Amino acid sequence: MPLSVYVESLGCSKNLIDAEVMLGILNQYGYKLTNNEVKADVIIVNTCGFIEAAKEESINKIIELGQLKKDKLKLLIVAGCLGERYQKDLLEELPEVDAIVGTGGYHEIVKVIHQTMKGQRIVEIGDINRPYDETLPRIQTTASHSAYIKISDGCDNYCTYCIIPKLRGKYRSRKMENIIQEAQTLANNGVKEIILIAQDTTRYGIDLYDEYRLSALLDKLSEVEGIQWIRILYCYPEMITDELIATIKNNDKVCKYIDIPIQHCSTKILKLMNRRTSKEEIVSLIEKLKKNVPNIVIRTSIIVGFPGESEEDFNELKAFIEDIKFDRLGVFTYSQEEGTPAAQLAEQVPSELKESRQKILMELQQRISLNKNRLYIGQSIEVLIEEEIAEKTEYLGRSQGDAPEIDGIVYVKSTVPLCVGQIVKVKIENALEYDLMGEGIHESSK
């Protein structure tokens, strides 16, 4: 009888794809996949080790699932960034863990299970710079109508606060034809929205083709029959070209949405972070985006409490956010991570002050977001239906301006039944801080 396996994926969408590949490999080798951890013989926890909060979440989940060894569970395997980061130390600190699989070793998951079933406790790290293996299968775990596509792995940016290059290796683009093929397979399975992800999507192609190819990739993806929305996440501001802006503007399938994690606006702090841009360049880029794509939704993320961030720097950041009025904003407190240059900087900001600054900016953004959402009242927008919440009358969905998990939702009332995965026109009638409410317009659905 085949072993049953449960995979728990923590952290970002890029990590989720690694988990989906492990599921594909296990399925290919005849393992029984289960969504119920209590019924599993083997549990794989695909961990995040990016910042302190993510490490704590991963450790807590490992300990929680380790309790199942009192019952049916035979093996507990830790994969992903936490395993890559701490390797043998993790195995020594957590006796309930049977094996560690690094970010360069998940393709060996079957071998790891075989060896641990023989009583060995092993560490399978692998090569974090290995080329992307296009032959590995993948089982999609997101909603059937929406899927992530990882267009590269690794990172060459070396921001001083970030451990990712040490966990994921150098930047490695996938071949364009393989990405197109994956998109077509997803479309054949009913996917309507694809979300392009990487540590840096704007760098796509430079290592393979000696030029940036994100715009060309978007144009090719838009030719895939069945795909209706193409969304781009994780764009570095200094890499957003006029060509990319023109593609977002002119390609009907590319969502009028862009995610640009700027991290700060103070040129002093940006230099300390080793970010290759300045406040003036960020402002110029945002003005160019708004001018060329008038209805574009801009998401960004900010780090507060970076070492050396003075009250003056923070006030500059606050004024910047008030002035720019981002459509979507995530604010994170700086996490002092061992092995990063920023961890050695003087003037580390106290935790209480970091949290206070985060709260101030999120309250500011809440007001900005509400005012922006109110502008949608009376407008008709396209909404991708994601869930039925009241039988045949009320639904949850997302607009082109909302990425899954991180952005808002649209509450939709309908006089006719709608299907999950359907894109419908919705007239917006009310607005909340982050969400919209509206009524379906049924003569134009697809």
Swiss-Prot record:
Domain (MTTase N-terminal): residue spans on this chain: 3-118
A cellular component term, taken from the record's GO annotations: cytosol
Subcellular location: Cytoplasm
Residues binding [4Fe-4S] cluster 2, per UniProt: 155, 159, 162
Residues of the signal peptide: none
Pfam families: Radical_SAM (PF04055), TRAM_2 (PF18693), UPF0004 (PF00919)
E.C. number: 2.8.4.4
Catalysed reactions listed for this entry: L-aspartate(89)-[ribosomal protein uS12]-hydrogen + (sulfur carrier)-SH + AH2 + 2 S-adenosyl-L-methionine = 3-methylsulfanyl-L-aspartate(89)-[ribosomal protein uS12]-hydrogen + (sulfur carrier)-H + 5'-deoxyadenosine + L-methionine + A + S-adenosyl-L-homocysteine + 2 H(+)
Cofactor: [4Fe-4S] cluster
Regions crossing the membrane: none
Domain annotation TRAM: ranges: 374-442
MF-aspect GO terms: 4 iron, 4 sulfur cluster binding; aspartic acid methylthiotransferase activity; metal ion binding; protein methylthiotransferase activity
Radical SAM core domain boundaries: 141-371
SUPFAM superfamilies reported for this sequence: Radical SAM enzymes
GO terms under biological process: tRNA modification
Gene3D superfamilies, sorted: Methylthiotransferase, N-terminal domain, Nucleic acid-binding proteins, tm_1862 like domain
Cofactor: binding details: Binds 2 [4Fe-4S] clusters. One cluster is coordinated with 3 cysteines and an exchangeable S-adenosyl-L-methionine.
Recorded coiled-coil stretches: none
Enzyme class, first EC level, given as a word: transferase
Entry binding sites for [4Fe-4S] cluster 1: 12, 48, 81
Role of this protein: Catalyzes the methylthiolation of an aspartic acid residue of ribosomal protein uS12.
Cited HAMAP family: MTTase_RimO
Similarity comment text for this entry: Belongs to the methylthiotransferase family. RimO subfamily.
Alphabetized NCBIfam families for the sequence: 30S ribosomal protein S12 methylthiotransferase RimO, miaB-methiolase, MiaB/RimO family radical SAM methylthiotransferase
Name the record gives this protein: Ribosomal protein uS12 methylthiotransferase RimO
Organism field: Alkaliphilus metalliredigens (strain QYMF)
